[in-house]
Structures are given as structure tokens and as C-alpha cells.
From Swiss-Prot:
Superkingdom, taxonomy of origin: Eukaryota
Family affiliation: Belongs to the UDP-glycosyltransferase family.
Keyword Transport: no
Enzyme class: transferase
Substrates-to-products reaction catalysed: beta-D-glucosyl crocetin + UDP-alpha-D-glucose = beta-D-gentiobiosyl crocetin + UDP + H(+); bis(beta-D-glucosyl) crocetin + UDP-alpha-D-glucose = beta-D-gentiobiosyl beta-D-glucosyl crocetin + UDP + H(+); beta-D-gentiobiosyl beta-D-glucosyl crocetin + UDP-alpha-D-glucose = bis(beta-D-gentiobiosyl) crocetin + UDP + H(+)
Alphabetically ordered keywords of this record: Glycosyltransferase, Transferase
Name of the gene: UGT94E5
PANTHER family: GLYCOSYLTRANSFERASE
Protein name: Beta-D-glucosyl crocetin beta-1,6-glucosyltransferase
Source organism (scientific name): Gardenia jasminoides (Cape jasmine)
Tissue specificity note: Ubiquitous.
Pfam families: UDPGT (PF00201)
Single GO BP term: carbohydrate derivative biosynthetic process
Anything else known: Crocin is a yellow pigment that accumulates during fruit development. No other crocetin glucosyl esters detected in neither flowers, leaves, nor stems. No correlation between mRNA expression and pigment accumulation.
Record bears the keyword Lipid biosynthesis: no
Length: 444
């Protein structure tokens, strides 16, 4: 397995690895030492025998020392540098494939150049998409049918979001063409297969549309959410869960924007005022880019912490997200709608209060609304979030009748996903076994 260098990618790879080893596979996960350190403590018991970690060392440069060989805490201006460094590690990855001789490779959909390496070693390979299928369907449609409206109107980008998305898409296309020229891409049967962190229960029509549009075979592997476990993060984690236990059922909202997006001061102020106006309990996870010397109280409105008192908790850097979402006192989740956060919300039946920031997040937010898993905080005409709109969305989700309806829909979605998960994983295990058999037979 070869994931992209982000915690939000490597976590689903680990969960998929666990489910495949339950079905008789042995797995190697290849990544940088700092990323492997993040998951090492989560490989326990029987999995410590069937899941092995393989270090991939990127070129070490003054501007990208080893602790920056991950997107977690990476200053945004170094993202392109990290991508170039990973591309520069192709020879080492090739040597790893030569040494391990795996039966097949599962690689990140963003790292398309991996396929050419696997061809050189006669190893079948499939892509793994850790984002939503609806997002991929939307952008593939724009590329294949420019000027024609996407056939699913619930999934759209506002004018403000389209401008940002166009720039990101152009950069991604240029990066892909530089490191994986279209003329050099292999065209094996397995190269049209995507494993996807999703379920037909929520994205079936988008899975079918991608096959109709581009003959891409999208195979769902379920939501791949780790079971809540007590994390070894010391007294702060224990104190937070104890505090949550003093609150009434579904009275508290979790606020978190993932490991890669850093809120501006203006965004933090609007969210803070929105939480204050809503009058609900909250846990707010705040993060600053690595190296920034800012205390949370310096970034928040003056007097905010004193005014909210015991109604809220500010946590810097990390909180046991799955444990908080699984807690009966949690009734809502204000998030950026990174795909991992969306599927965790579905897994634990907690309505989403969507505040998408960039990349795939706006499209994920629209899917959340479409399937009834939450509501979106609408930006103003300038593309900014407003405190009153934030407070309104929180109250709708947590206090008003709409919140009860959303919770009921969320539980229905959760049930439908759970019904399909085992069958979907069994089908994927069967297909991977078949790929290996066919490759072995063709080599003999």
C-alpha cells in the first residue's frame, strides 16, 4: 500500500489493511517515517503480525527536513516542495517493489505515476480514492463534457468556489502531466479500477455515472472508520471526555477543521461569536501551522473564554475526535467536510454543520445536505462566513425540530451503509485475489 503523505489518507489505508488481513491478506504499508510513526501505535494484537510498515525516505533538503515529510502541520507554501520530494523518491520505491515482490499494489489515486513503476515489475495495481466519488464524478464531468450541466444538481460549486477550484485543477493537471505524462500511462484492465472509501448506500448513482462516463470501475470498501479507542494522549484527553460526560445528551457540538487547514483570524472570530450566540456547549479544536508562536487566547476575541466559561473547551492541536463523536453528549459536528470527517459523522450518527473551506470540501458539503446528514453554513455574497449564520445553523442542528429530523435521517443513512459494508469488502477481496491469479498465469 502506498498512500499520499497525509494523515487523512494514511488512516483509511490502515483501516482497509485491517479489513483485508481479516480476509487472509498480508499487507505492507509504505510511507515516510513520520507518517508511519503516526499509525504504528494503532497496529496492535493480530494486526502486528499481518501488517508491516516499510519506510520510504525522501530526499532530505534544508527547506524540507524529515519532520516536514507529511502534510500534517506543513506550512502551505511547502506543499509543492513536498510533492516534488515524493516524486523524487521513485527510484527508492522501485527498489522497495523489487525487494518485497508484492502480489499487487494499492496506491493513492493522486499518485498516478505509481502505475508505471508497477508495470516495470509486472505487478498488478489498483488506485485507492480516499475522497468522495461524487467529487470525482463532478470534476470528471467538467473535463469530459465542458459546458454541459452536471446531471445531479444537488452537487455544485458556487461562483466563489468555482474560481478557486479552477486554479487548483489547473495546478493538479500540470503537476500530473509533469510527473506522469499521459503518453506513458499504462492501460491494463486493473488501471481502470478504483477502490473507494464510500458505500453504494450513499454514492451509488455517482459510482454508476463514472462507469458510464469514463468506464471507471469504482469498488466501494465502506467507510473505514477506526473504532473509538482510548488514545495515549495523557490527562488532557481524559479530562475532556470527563467534562463531556457532565453535559446532557446531544447538547454539545464538536468544532474541528482537520489537520491541514488553518483558520484565518477573521474566520476564528466569526466562529467564536457564532458559538457564543448559539448558547450551546462546544469543544473546539484549534490548530496553527507548525512554527507559529500563537496561543489560542491570542487568536480569539477578547473576553471570549471568560464569557463562555464552562460551556466550552478550547483544545489546541489534537482531540480524540472519534471518541468525542461517539459520546452521547455530542449532538453536532462543525467541520470543513473533509471526507474523513464526513464519514466519521455518518458512522457515529452525528449531524454535520458544514463549513467547507477548499479543495473537495464544498462538494462534500453538498452531498451531506443531499443525503440528509446535515446542513451547510451559507457564506455571504463576498464568500465569507457570518457569525449570525453560524449561530443559526448550530441552533437548527442542535435545538430546533430540524435537528431531530436530521438525526433521524442520519441514523437511516448509517444503517444502510452498515448493511452493505461486509458484502462490498468481500467483493473487493475476491477481485484482488483474481487479479493476482490472472497476473501469475499470464507470467507462466
Amino acid at each position: 500500500m502506498f498512500p499520499w503523505l497525509a494523515y487523512g489518507h494514511i488512516s483509511p489505508y490502515l483501516e482497509l489493511a485491517k479489513r483485508l488481513t481479516d480476509r487472509g491478506f498480508a499487507i505492507y504499508i509504505c510511507s515516510t517515517p513520520i507518517n508511519l510513526g503516526f499509525i504504528k501505535k494503532r497496529i496492535t494484537g493480530k494486526y502486528s503480525v499481518t501488517i508491516k510498515l516499510v519506510e520510504l525516505h525522501l530526499p532530505d533538503t534544508p527547506e524540507l527536513p524529515p519532520h516536514y515529510h507529511t502534510t500534517n502541520g506543513l506550512p502551505p507554501h511547502l506543499m509543492a516542495t513536498l510533492k516534488r520530494a515524493l516524486n523524487g523518491a521513485k527510484p527508492e520505491l522501485s527498489n522497495i517493489l523489487k525487494t518485497l515482490k508484492p502480489d499487487f499494489v494499492i496506491y493513492d489515486a493522486t499518485q498516478t505515476w505509481t502505475a508505471a513503476l508497477t508495470v516495470a515489475h509486472n505487478i498488478p495495481a489498483v488506485k485507492f480514492l480516499t475522497s468522495s466519488v461524487s467529487m470525482l464524478a463532478y470534476f470528471c464531468h467538467l473535463f469530459m463534457k465542458p459546458g454541459i450541466e452536471f446531471p445531479f444538481p444537488a452537487i455544485y460549486l458556487s461562483d466563489f468556489e468555482q474560481a478557486k477550484a479552477r486554479t487548483a485543477a489547473q495546478d493538479a493537471r500540470a503537476d500530473a502531466e509533469e510527473n506522469d505524462p499521459a503518453a506513458e500511462r499504462p492501460n491494463r484492465d486493473c488501471d481502470s479500477i478504483f477502490l473507494v472509501k464510500s458505500s453504494r448506500a450513499i454514492e451509488g448513482k455517482y459510482i454508476d455515472y463514472l462507469f458510464d462516463l469514463m468506464k471507471l470501475k469504482m469498488l466501494p470498501v465502506g467507510m473505514l472508520v477506526e473504532e473509538p479507542v482510548k488514545d495515549d494522549q495523557g490527562d488532557n484527553s481524559n479530562e475532556l471526555i470527563q467534562w463531556l460526560g457532565t453535559k446532557s445528551q446531544r447538547s454539545t457540538v464538536l468544532v474541528s477543521f482537520g489537520t491541514e487547514y488553518f483558520l484565518t483570524k477573521e474566520e476564528m472570530e466569526e466562529i467564536a461569536h457564532g458559538l457564543e450566540l448559539s448558547e450551546v456547549n462546544f469543544i473546539w479544536v484549534v490548530r496553527f501551522a507548525m512554527g507559529q508562536k500563537i496561543r489560542p487566547d491570542e487568536a480569539l476575541p477578547e473576553g471570549f473564554l471568560e464569557r463562555v466559561g464552562d460551556r466550552g473547551r478550547i483544545v489546541e492541536g489534537w482531540a480524540p475526535q472519534s471518541e468525542v463523536l461517539a459520546h452521547p453528549s455530542t449532538g453536532g459536528f462543525i467541520c470543513h467536510c473533509g471526507w474523513n470527517s464526513v464519514v466519521e459523522s455518518i458512522e457515529f450518527g452525528v449531524p454535520v454543520i458544514a463549513m467547507p473551506m477548499h479543495l473537495d470540501q464544498p462538494l462534500n458539503a453538498r452531498l451531506v445536505v443531499e443525503i440528509g446528514a446535515g446542513m451547510e453554513v451559507v457564506r455571504d455574497e463576498t464568500g465569507k462566513f457570518d457569525r449570525k449564520e453560524i449561530a443559526r445553523a448550530i441552533k437548527d442542528a442542535m435545538v430546533e425540530k430540524t435537528g431531530e429530523n436530521t438525526r433521524a435521517k442520519m441514523l437511516d443513512v448509517k444503517g444502510r451503509v452498515e448493511l452493505k459494508e461486509k458484502q462490498e469488502l468481500d467483493e473487493v477481496a475476491e477481485l484482488l485475489t483474481q487479479l493476482v491469479t490472472e497476473t501469475t498465469q499470464s507470467s507462466n
